[in-house]
Design a protein with these regions (language model features):
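A detector for short, charged/polar N-terminal pre-domain segments
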Residues: 1-11
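A basic, amphipathic helix-loop patch mediating RNA/tRNA/ribosome contacts
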Residues: 13-53
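Short, Lys/Arg- and Gly-enriched loop/turn segments at beta-strand edges
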Residues: 66-70
Length: 70
């Protein structure tokens, strides 16, 4: 499992931006496509909100990839 550290003073990152920053997708359009196709899970549940706020402690999963926000 990867760890993703939020920036100092940042409370959250949007789901589509996180999976793009982690390199799991190449573009924002692909991120939207993957979320719309119910391929992304947050804390074990399928997530369809593109702008879902990922906060410290949340675990995001895509295929065999997992990351925890710190």
């Amino acid at each position: 499992m990867e760890n993703f550290k939020l920036q100092e003073g940042e409370e959250y990152i949007e789901l589509k931006n996180l999976i793009k920053l982690l390199g799991w997708v190449n573009t924002g359009g692909e991120a939207t496509f993957r979320i719309d196709n119910k391929e992304i899970k947050v804390n074990g549940e399928i997530e369809t909100q593109r702008r879902k706020k990922i906060r410290r402690g949340d675990i995001v999963m895509f295929g065999t990839n997992q990351a925890k926000a710190l």
